Amino acid sequence: MEELTAFVSKSFDQKSKDGNGGGGGGGGKKDSITYREVLESGLARSRELGTSDSSLQDITEGGGHCPVHLFKDHVDNDKEKLKEFGTARVAEGIYECKEKREDVKSEDEDGQTKLKQRRSRTNFTLEQLNELERLFDETHYPDAFMREELSQRLGLSEARVQVWFQNRRAKCRKQENQMHKGVILGTANHLDACRVAPYVNMGALRMPFQQVQAQLQLEGVAHAHPHLHPHLAAHAPYLMFPPPPFGLPIASLAESASAAAVVAAAAKSNSKNSSIADLRLKARKHAEALGL
């Protein structure tokens, strides 16, 4: 429509100028230019562009130059069509994005479901654990027949039983390594999980007040018998920190027992010597009192 308006206005202005120029010359024939001729040429042009005849009819009835406001309706219609088209495209894009989000969400849910299935754990009852521990005490590596029999008796699958024994052996190896490194694992509860020679179950640790009491006893013995001080100093660690009844290697227990025996023998011999010295001192005092 804008092209049609520009063409009509341009044609009318050009023909008007040509007519005025010819009249001014005086010699030439004056061409009669009418507005209808311009409109007819514009009509032909509009048919080529596909414009409706109603718009040209409005221009013919209005007269004068081609008013632009007559084409406002067509421009508004075009804008509405463009707006509807754009809205449809936006809606289509939103729908596609929504579908993609739903697909991604469904994939994430599937992945989470797979992870949850992999992390499924079996909660054993106390009876099942007792049976498993009893068989583990007998052998750490049960064969397929033993696992199958145990699984049927406990109502578990053979795979679950096999996995339990694998985890149990791993736990036992870990405890063995810690015991070899001298790491004290726990308190009064025994490590009945692992039964490996030459190690035995570990007992409770000595309390701090017991250590203080042992130190006081050591100081009292050293003060009463000064001649035993070197022996007590040599074996002070064994007296201050007596070995627990359980939890140390047999070699360490034997060494501490031999050290205690040496200290006891030294104390016994020294006590005999001290008693003889006391008797001699008393006899000397008695002789002096009698004036002998």
From Swiss-Prot:
Residues 1-34, 100-119 are annotated as: Disordered. Pfam families: Homeodomain, OAR. One of its GO terms (biological process) is skeletal system development. One of its GO terms (molecular function) is DNA-binding transcription factor activity, RNA polymerase II-specific. It comes from the Eukaryota. A motif (SH3-binding) lies at residues 242-249. Its main location: nucleus. Keywords: Activator, Developmental protein, Disease variant, DNA-binding, Dwarfism, Homeobox, Nucleus, Transcription, Transcription regulation. GO terms for cellular component: chromatin; intracellular membrane-bounded organelle; nucleoplasm; nucleus. Residues 117-176 bind DNA. Induction: By retinoic acid and phorbol-12-myristate 13-acetate (PMA). SHOXA is expressed in skeletal muscle, placenta, pancreas, heart and bone marrow fibroblast and SHOXB is highly expressed in bone marrow fibroblast followed by kidney and skeletal muscle. SHOXB is not expressed in brain, kidney, liver and lung. Highly expressed in osteogenic cells. A motif (OAR) lies at residues 274-287. It is found in: Nucleus. It is linked to Leri-Weill dyschondrosteosis: Dominantly inherited skeletal dysplasia characterized by moderate short stature predominantly because of short mesomelic limb segments. It is often associated with the Madelung deformity of the wrist, comprising bowing of the radius and dorsal dislocation of the distal ulna. Langer mesomelic dysplasia: Autosomal recessive rare skeletal dysplasia characterized by severe short stature owing to shortening and maldevelopment of the mesomelic and rhizomelic segments of the limbs. Associated malformations are rarely reported and intellect is normal in all affected subjects reported to date. Belongs to the paired homeobox family. Bicoid subfamily. The gene coding for this protein is located in the pseudoautosomal region 1 (PAR1) of X and Y chromosomes. Controls fundamental aspects of growth and development. This is Short stature homeobox protein. The lineage of its organism: Eukaryota, Metazoa, Chordata, Craniata, Vertebrata. The gene is SHOX.
